[in-house]
Amino acid sequence: QAYVAARTERAERTKALSMLASSFGVGTVIGPATAHYFLFPPFGLAGPLIMFAAFGVAVLIALHVQLPNDTPRFEARGAIAAYPNSASMNSPDTEDVDGDALGSVLPASEVRLPWRDERMASWLIAGLIGGHAQAIILGVVGFLVRDRLGLHDRPWEAVQASGLVMLIGAMATLLAQWGLIPMLSLAARSSVLLGAILALLGTILTGISHDFYGISTGFAIASLGFGLFRPGFTAGASLAVRRHEQGDVAGKIASINGAAYIVAPAVGVALFNYWEPATFILISASLLFLIIWGRRALVLPETAV
């Protein structure tokens, strides 16, 4: 994310980060559709994990060979400090304009932003709430398909049906990130709120459906919503801070995304086993809170670049 932010204008950043997020979506489309081909002897069910490790090595090599050198597009240049005159007292902060403006100087030391920084705190909270909601529904959708379709005694059919539902959801996510965000030129706040609304509707439909078509349709709508939400939250946090702070906020966003998958899936499955509707009530309540609270809290400072 910091690499992309250092090479894009402020107006382009939402689209650029959407494309970055969609690269993860490609994997969620290809993965469920091809995973069963990697079940081969002698590894068996561990086959996909072995292939995942091999792909990781291949990506590492490709990055080393193909990724351009880490030289930001917006380099620091200009005077270290303004000349002491009356005009400089009233001049705007050099970072209030884009990074290629005269006098844009980056700090020599590494930037460490507090988690409670008011510029980005609301975006990180939104990411934490929406990320947990998505992690929960991803954790239970396979069990939901198995239970609602009565596939307890047919595990291979359950795997195929669950994989197909997840494939449909992943394609909906890509539709949002490759189609809707660039076509509609959605701003970060609009992307988060619209995504949360669609995710809420999709979650409700998934929770009340008892056949494959209803579940897959509901999950597709929810995935479409989360596909809008994630790039919006990422872009919002990025746009809230200055260019030289992008590395720190990128690390915080990565932490937020990872934190959602530590406890949330286990909590979702536990609630699902206790009482199926409880899981979807929790997800829906979280998204409803995000929509109501986000309309007031998600704002961008005008001076960030």
Give the role of each language-model region.
Residues 47-64, 279-295:
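Symmetry-related core transmembrane helices of the 12-TM Major Facilitator Superfamily/SLC fold
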Residues 175-188:
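Helix-to-loop junctions at the C-terminal end of transmembrane segments
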Residues 190-204:
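Structural signature of the two symmetry-related core transmembrane helices
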Residues 1-8, 228-241:
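Intracellular juxtamembrane helix-capping segments at the cytosolic ends
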Residues 1-24:
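Cytoplasmic helix-loop-helix junction between adjacent transmembrane helices
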Residues 17-32, 256-264:
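Glycine-rich segments within core transmembrane alpha-helices of 12-TM secondary carriers
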Residues 70-124:
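Juxtamembrane intracellular "pre-TM" segments in multi-pass secondary transporters
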Residues 151-170:
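Loop-to-transmembrane helix entry
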